[in-house]
Amino acid sequence: MRPRAAHEPGKRHASHNYSDALSGLCRQVSATVKLSGTLLNENSMAFATPITPAIGAEIQGLDLRRHLDATTKAWVAEQLVQHKVIFFRDQQISAQQHLEFARQFGQLETHPVNPKDGFPELLVLHNDSDRPPADTAIWHSDVTWRPQPSLGSILIARKVPEVGGDTLFANMEAAYTGLDDSIKAQIDGCNAIHRFEPMRGYLLESGADAEQLAKFEKKYPDVTHPIVRTHPVTGRKSIYVNALFTVGIEGMTDAQAQPLLDKLFATATRPEYQCRFQWRESSIAFWDNRAAQHYATADYYPHERLMERATIEGDTPV
């Protein structure tokens, strides 16, 4: 064990440096996220309660079985952009109502794997003793291997294990703000390469053969997106690479790109940028895929976990 250095007069102790760094981090997070809960209007009783200073809010007072009026829809969209992920509890909605809620925020994607019978726009995520969680439990943004990745995803819990199976979310705008200026300068204007490859496992599980795999890989060749994405609503910058789908940086060799990517990937793992959601049946998470990453813990195996996700089409990252 390395001996602890004695405190020298006239020099600041390391703990003071850590404290200063943490205070600076908190200021960066606070500059990105507004901390107060928000009442929708005096007639509705709907309000948002932040989960952490960095990301996440729980919305109470809304019944998602009902169509949202224009004011309420705009308010929900505002909470999504502000908090990056919003949560709803005890929403007893059917698959059709799930889709109707999601369609209020845009056109829906049809995911290439595991659609729900009769509802091709719903992705089924079902794990139990016979279907262990996939090895894609890695920090990521959804479908960045598409030219126009998702705007957002709306995930509902249908069956949950007694304990475990939480999902973590990270604010990638705060992560960008926390970067050293030298790294910001290094990645400014750079594009990263994103690849469909990790989805092969899901396709194989769903029964795809070699010919079908080849068709998917032809349909989804590698794409490039800016490493620093500008949010189309707020204009804020965020880190837009992820450890699951990003495989390189345009114009760099692997040896040059990987150390930089590893630094950027690691920002999502900082607890100061995160919140953690404990699922209950009929809970919903709605996240902004343009500014947040997520990580589904696989600690519940062999117990059952059944989730369904609607995904909203996005635009081309800039």
Spans of features found by a protein language model:
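Short hydrophobic alpha-helical segments enriched in small aliphatic residues
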Residues: 8, 14-17, 21, 31
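Fe(II)/2-oxoglutarate oxygenase catalytic core
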Residues: 39-286, 290-318
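N-terminal cationic leader/targeting segments used for protein routing and processing
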Residues: 12, 18, 35, 42-44
